[in-house]
């Protein structure tokens, strides 16, 4: 396989030197991903640029992305937006969604929520799940468009049905809150669970909450496991919850040191509840040196318990 990739890169090289914009973009990919060529993001940018300047939409998007994240070239959100725009004008759905993001956040362009919606719609109509979810957000909150919960649900569902975790989670939250749809906790649990199983930390936290509260028939005994999954992905709210569980012995052997560790992780991310919990432990004489040391330790104990 390695020989095949190297050979492919050689053919791309020859074609790229002869001016093939598709080959130039492909060679850029070889350098960017380290396939058939040693990984070199600066070289990737140069080949993307050659293709982009010939009007190749995928290369224009790739170059915009490199500018946006500052990989292989100095970061410039304005140049990122310029290249996204060029590709978006050619109907490139990923670029249309990215350009919509620029307008929504005001990165590289003057913030304009209505323009963001316009570009999201272009991408969403081509089946771009991220843009569909973003449209759901815009209709739910009234960003750049008249607020309409029913339409928000329609866009969330389009993306959720394609397995997009963020949309699945939002659909679950809308069902839980009765926002744009009849309140239904079983549907809420179903959709948040799909998102959680797809690895979305926020949805994993939500599932922990649903399980803890017994929402929609969720199993209370599963709460700890979901909070652990979210906490491992640095979700501060889940880290705080693990602290609560360990401090009080909810579903796990009571362990003040482990509680202090998780509270500290959450507090380090700015979680106010965790900061208050640490203050309370210290004022109660529970913030011992041992607990402080445990707070700085690794995160293996929870998984050891869960795995047996």
Per-region residue spans from a language model:
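Short helix-capping/linker turns of helical repeat alpha-solenoids
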Residues: 12, 17-20, 33-35, 40, ...
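Short hydrophobic alpha-helical membrane-entry/anchor segments
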Residues: 284-288, 299-308
């Amino acid at each position: 396989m390695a020989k095949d990739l190297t050979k492919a890169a050689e053919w791309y090289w020859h074609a790229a030197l002869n001016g093939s914009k598709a080959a130039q973009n492909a060679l850029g990919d070889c350098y960017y991903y380290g396939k058939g060529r040693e990984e070199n993001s600066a070289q990737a940018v140069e080949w993307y640029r050659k293709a982009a300047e010939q009007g190749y939409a995928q290369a224009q998007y790739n170059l915009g992305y490199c500018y946006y994240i500052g990989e292989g070239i100095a970061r410039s959100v304005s140049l990122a937006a310029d290249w996204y725009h060029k590709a978006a004008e050619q109907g490139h759905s990923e670029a249309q969604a990215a350009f919509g993001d620029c307008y929504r956040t005001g990165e590289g362009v003057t913030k304009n929520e209505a323009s963001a919606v316009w570009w999201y719609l272009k991408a969403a109509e081509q089946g771009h799940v991220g843009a569909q979810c973003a449209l759901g957000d815009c209709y739910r909150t009234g960003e750049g468009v008249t607020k309409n919960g029913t339409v928000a649900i329609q866009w969330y569902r389009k993306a959720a049905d394609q397995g997009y975790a963020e949309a699945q989670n939002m659909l679950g939250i809308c069902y839980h809150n009765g926002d744009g749809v009849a309140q239904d906790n079983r549907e809420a649990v179903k959709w948040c669970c799909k998102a959680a199983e797809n690895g979305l930390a926020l949805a994993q936290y939500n599932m922990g909450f649903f399980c803890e509260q017994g929402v929609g028939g969720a199993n209370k005994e599963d709460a700890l496991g979901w909070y652990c999954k979210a906490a491992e992905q640095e979700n501060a709210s889940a880290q705080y919850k693990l602290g609560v569980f360990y401090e009080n012995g909810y579903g796990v052997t009571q362990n003040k040191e482990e509680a202090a560790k998780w509270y500290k992780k959450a507090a380090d991310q700015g979680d106010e509840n965790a900061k208050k919990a640490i203050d309370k432990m210290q004022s109660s004489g529970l913030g011992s040196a041992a607990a402080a040391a445990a707070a700085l330790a690794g995160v293996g104990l929870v998984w050891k318990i869960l795995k047996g």
